[in-house]
């Protein structure tokens, strides 16, 4: 059992710490579309395939508009009571922290690579990612901004809210001001949708995906190994059933070496009232397997 490894898909481990308002924490980032249009993309190896990903660090360094724009959106969100994670600060913390690593290593030396984007989400622990896209329109001496805001659940990457529009033409040359003017009239509705999604999580649990893998060096142990007449995968599925909100989960696929669960609803708080992250849920499963099966 000690060689089983649990992976949380979209490996991000937000910890929920709520004040009385119980509002989700947000992190505003430039959208993939904006990064691609402005040349701030890079490539990372994902299971042997090179995939494009946004290069936020390079964008913040080289684009003088990006930081003021994000700061202005952060201000609008803060005015409505949302706790915020600062993109620039989180990136600096990752780069300066020698403990940060690009890989998760098991006790047996096997590794599961973690992308730079996953590291950022792990570090920031934001409940919702707000992606921002904007373009500047020129009409004679006046300028306006067309924008799109997308709220994404940080675990599932599902879009939960969107807002788009174009501000009134203005003589001002300051991009953050133009953007704020364009966004402000739609911000309350956008924030209401973010809050509605989070309220659903409070009632019905956080949706995550859970993957279980058996390392190649696991010897004779796999998910078909029997303990007291039950296969290991049956034992795992029973535990997931008992520990999800209203037993809501879906075993999408499984074999003797892997199990893929999706639509897994985990509680936001444990039995002691402490905030529960996806990593806590996975560790509880690991503890259960070690304690239950070591004596069988």
Question: Which role does the model predict for each range below?
Answer:
Residues 4-13:
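Sec-dependent N-terminal signal peptides
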